Amino acid sequence: MRTSPAYPDRRTAFWVPVAIAALLLGGCDRDRPTDIAAEIARIRAIDNHAHPVRVVGPGEQDREFDALPVDNMEPASDPVYLRPGAPGTLEARRTLFGQLGKPRVTQQKGDGYPAWVLDQMGVDVMLANRVQMGRGIEPPRFRWVPYVDALLFPLNNSKLAARNSDRRAFFADEETLLRRYLKDAGLAASPASLDDYLTGVVTPTLERQKQGGAVAEKFEAAYLRPLDFDKVDRSAAARVYSQFRAKGAPPDDQYKILQDYLFRYIAGECGRLGMAVHIHTMAGAGSYFDVEGANPLRLESVLNDPGLRKTKFVMLHGGWPFIGEITALLEKPNAWLDFSAQSLMLPPATLAHNLRQWLEWVPEKVLFGTDAYPYSDEMGWEESGWLAARRGREALALALTAMMRDGEISHDRALELARMVLHENARKLYGL
C-alpha cells in the first residue's frame, strides 16, 4: 500500500517487530499473522463499491456521488465510527494530507487527485457508484456503476413519498433522475404502454449506460421499499401501468406488481448486456430505514429464478446484521457479496468474525469494498475510503490468522484467499 512520503505505513511499523517476536518464539506455520498482514498490505485491491467525488472547479459542487444523498435526513443515532471525532478520522487526514492540508493537496494533484487517493488506499481499481462519471473519475482506475431505481417508479409516487420525510426527499430525487432518463430517451413523459416504456426507456437507458462503460447497475431500493421482488406476469404489470399512468397514485399492492416486474426485467437485461446487479443489503442511513425489509433472504426468489441465472447479483455491504442469512445465499450460483460499509463501521475484530464465516463457506464469492463516501466535511470519501481499506485489511488478516491457528488452512492457502478477496474474485466477476 502506497503512503504519503511524510507518513510511513503505520501497519508495517507495527507488524514488523511482532513478526520478529513470533519468529524468535518459534511459532509454527499456522501461527504467523504478521506474514499475512504484511502480504495483505502489499496487495493492490479492487474496491467493489464506493462513491468518489469528482474534481470540481471554484464554486462548483458535485452531488452526483449518490442518487439518494443521505446528508439531509432527520437526525438519527449515528454509528460510533461515523460520528464527529470518530476513531481514526484524524489519523486518516494526517496520513493522507500531512502538514500541507487537504485543500493544498487537492489543488496540487489536480485532475489526478482521485487516482492519487486510490494509491493511498492501496486500491488499483474502484467501482464508482455515481449518477454520472466526471472529472478525474475515469477508467481505467474507476469503473462506472450507475443507478436504476428510478426506472422502478414510473407512476405517481405521492403516496409512497408521504410515508415520512426521508421517503419524501428520496422520491423527489428518483423522479428527477427518471426525468433525466426520459429526456435521454427523447421523451417528456412516460410512454402510454408498458411495452413502450420497456423498449423506449428502460432497455435504451441500460444500453446507453453499458456503452458508457458501466460494469454493473445499482439498486438502493431498500431505502424505498422491501427487497421482496416477486415473479409477476407481464400482463398483470401492463394492466397496472396502463390503468394508473395518467391517474392518481396507485394502491400499494398494485404498484408493487409493476415494480416487481420491472426489477426482474431490468435484472434480466443486465444479464443479457453483461452487467452485474448491485443491491444494497444492510441496515441503512436514517431513522426511518426498514431494516427487516433489507434482509437479503427477501431476494431468494430472485436468485432462484431460472430466467435470471445469467445475471450476477452482488449483495452490497454483506447484509449486516443478517450475516448468517446472506452466508447461506452464497451457495446460489448467481450470488456474490462485498463487505463495503462494514469495513468502515465495524471494528476489525467484529468484521473478522463475519469474514471468517464467508471464507469458510464460499470464499470465491467474497469481495473487498469500502463504501468510501463524503459523509461530512471532516470525513470525506478520501478519509472514509482510507479508513475502510485499512480496517478491511486488518479484519481479513485477523480472520485468516484465526483459520490458520485452528488448522483449517495453511499459510499458503491464507495468502491465496487474501489475494482472492482483495483482487481476484472481483477481477473474474467483472472481467477486469
Regions found by a protein language model. Name each.
Residues 46-50, 125-128, 143-148, 217-219, ...:
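Hydrophobic faces of well-ordered beta-strands that scaffold small-molecule active sites
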Residues 25-27:
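C-terminal motif of bacterial Sec signal peptides marking the signal peptidase cleavage site
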Residues 2-16:
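Bacterial N-terminal signal peptides that target proteins for export
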Residues 167-187, 232-253, 393-401:
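A solvent-exposed, charged loop/short amphipathic helix patch at secondary-structure junctions
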Residues 41, 60-146, 151-155, 164-189, ...:
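Alpha-helical scaffold segments that flank or form the walls of functional sites
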Residues 194-219, 226-335, 349-367:
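Histidine/acidic residue-rich metal-binding segments in metalloenzymes
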Residues 32-48, 60-62, 66-109, 363-365, ...:
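Mid-to-C-terminal alpha-helical segments outside catalytic/metal-binding sites
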Residues 294-298, 303-314, 318-432:
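H/E-rich (His + Asp/Glu) clusters that bind or coordinate divalent metals
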